[in-house]
Amino acid sequence: MAKRLCAILGASGIVSQRLQQRLANHPWFELVAICGGPDTAGKPLSSIGWKLEQQRPTLAEITVLDLSNSKICKQLLELGVSIVFSAIPSEIAQDVEPMLAESGFAVFSNASAYRRVDGIPLVIAEINP
């Protein structure tokens, strides 16, 4: 089975870094892009400070894409991304996540922005594995 190409929204936060750990060497997913804000966009992922106690995972060298770029959907599509894991704040997620979903990406979000919206499932591992 070919791995599904995925991206993470958010580059420097703890949730993003936990996602990076979980996606490194995953049997189903290949992390090919990380999108960040003005403080991280354009930087190599390896240059961004690591906050977790566990060691930084070994990932391909990724340059952080600018999440505010109006062509972010096109950039992700060109990379072959079909799945996006979002670790961005709710106030940013409200604008970015619907745009990505409308462009055909499957979006899995940690943000609270859409937790109570009909038609958007809430995934809780202990309840719906």
Model-derived features with residue positions:
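N-terminal Rossmann-like NAD(P) cofactor-binding subdomain of oxidoreductases
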Residues: 1-129
